[in-house]
């Protein structure tokens, strides 16, 4: 390295250090302009069987994503809870036209991804393999190969998973929260057990598929390096054979809040921490006038690391690693507000007091202007 080069490097470094020293770190930097977001306007069409197709062309990268969504209302499974889960596990294991092994091998060979659940499917691939991926997705969705052998395997997996959760505090807490909020006669309140899974037969899975995995309530969203006319042609080719069916019409009791504050305890002798949740039923819809205001209020209360309950219970009191709240919305009916925290057993009562205090404060006292401004900027 020459002396001249050394001087240049030294001067550059010195200039950078000097410039950095001139920055006033006590003043928050002014935000730059908001980024321009262009989501793309979808083009759409419907098949005769009821399948609704949305297409967004984006040719920036040579890839494409497909989302098949079955938009059913919540389904009450009763003493056969686990049927939907087993149905989802058995979908995507090949089809009546291709074995599971050949199906998985081809997807791997294409460097693609294809996943199924009882509520639809998701695929992603390079755009040059788009046609074949749509064909594989449609074939597995329309012609599932439900066999007793695979059913028994998936049933054993599900039961093993349930057994592993029997002493997991967070899993038990989640079940109890839903059961208390919605009641066991509501789809969100029931939960799967080993007994309910053992009640499920292969015939139940086949019946669930026929009744609920139907195109009448289905959407196929295609986004990426595709052409609208090509998507339309391929969809008509591969999805037209999906049998038209009447969409399910379901009814069940609507959950309501308890008239007074109710305290429920579950003794877990193996637990080294207490899991606390304060919850209630809310009937929030995205179409509500105060929807955004409600989301902002929850963000201030417990939506992040700088939220009120986290600053109180973690930063001030040192009770926990994190305390948060969530606010649900559901077009099919009531959902939940929940504020949750895991704390040392010895500070359980104090944590409950602080949670209730923060919830009371945000309900009774106006939010400070600066707090609201900061939350809006972060949201």
Kindly give the residue locations of the regions a language model identified:
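Mature N-terminal segment immediately following signal peptide/propeptide cleavage
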Residues: 31, 35-64
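Bacterial Sec-dependent N-terminal signal peptides
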Residues: 1-24
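Short, solvent-exposed loop/turn segments at the edges of secondary structure
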Residues: 61-63, 81, 116-118, 172, ...
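A short acidic-to-branched-hydrophobic micro-motif
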Residues: 53, 65-71, 137, 275-277
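M16/MPP (pitrilysin/insulinase) zinc-metallopeptidase core fold and M16-derived inactive scaffolds
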Residues: 67-127, 190, 304-319, 331
């Amino acid at each position: 390295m020459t002396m001249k080069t050394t001087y240049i490097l030294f001067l550059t470094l010195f200039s950078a250090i000097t410039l950095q020293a001139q920055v006033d770190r006590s003043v928050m930097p002014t935000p730059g302009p908001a980024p321009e977001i262009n989501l793309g306007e979808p083009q759409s069409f419907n098949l005769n069987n009821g399948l609704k197709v949305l297409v967004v062309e984006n040719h920036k990268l040579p890839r494409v994503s497909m989302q098949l969504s079955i938009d059913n209302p919540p389904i009450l499974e009763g003493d056969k809870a686990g049927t939907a889960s087993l149905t989802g596990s058995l979908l995507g294991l090949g089809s009546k036209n291709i074995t599971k092994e050949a199906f998985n091998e081809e997807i791997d060979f294409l460097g693609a991804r294809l996943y199924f659940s009882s509520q639809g499917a998701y695929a992603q691939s390079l755009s040059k393999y788009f046609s074949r991926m749509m064909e594989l997705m449609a074939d597995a969705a329309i012609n599932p190969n439900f066999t007793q052998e695979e059913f028994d395997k998936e049933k054993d997996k599900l039961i093993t998973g349930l057994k592993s959760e029997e002493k997991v505090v967070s899993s038990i807490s989640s079940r109890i929260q839903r059961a208390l909020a919605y009641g066991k006669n509501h789809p969100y309140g029931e939960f799967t057990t080993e007994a309910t899974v053992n009640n499920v037969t292969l015939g139940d899975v086949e019946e669930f598929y026929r009744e609920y995995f139907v195109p009448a309530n289905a959407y196929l969203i295609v986004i990426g390096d595709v052409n609208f006319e090509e998507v339309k042609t391929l969809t008509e080719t591969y999805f037209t054979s999906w049998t038209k069916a009447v969409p399910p019409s379901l009814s069940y009791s609507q959950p309501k809040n308890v008239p007074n504050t109710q305290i429920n305890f579950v003794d877990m002798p193996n637990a080294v921490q207490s899991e606390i949740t304060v919850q209630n039923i809310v009937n929030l819809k995205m179409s509500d006038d105060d929807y955004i205001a409600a989301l902002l209020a929850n963000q201030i209360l417990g939506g992040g690391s700088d939220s009120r309950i986290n600053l109180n219970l973690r930063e001030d009191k040192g009770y926990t690693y994190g305390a948060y709240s969530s606010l649900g919305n559901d077009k099919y009916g009531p959902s939940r507000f929940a504020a949750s925290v895991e704390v040392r057993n010895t500070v359980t009562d104090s944590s409950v007091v602080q949670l209730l205090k923060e919830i009371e404060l945000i309900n009774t006292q106006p939010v400070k202007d600066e707090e609201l401004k900061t939350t809006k900027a972060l949201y």
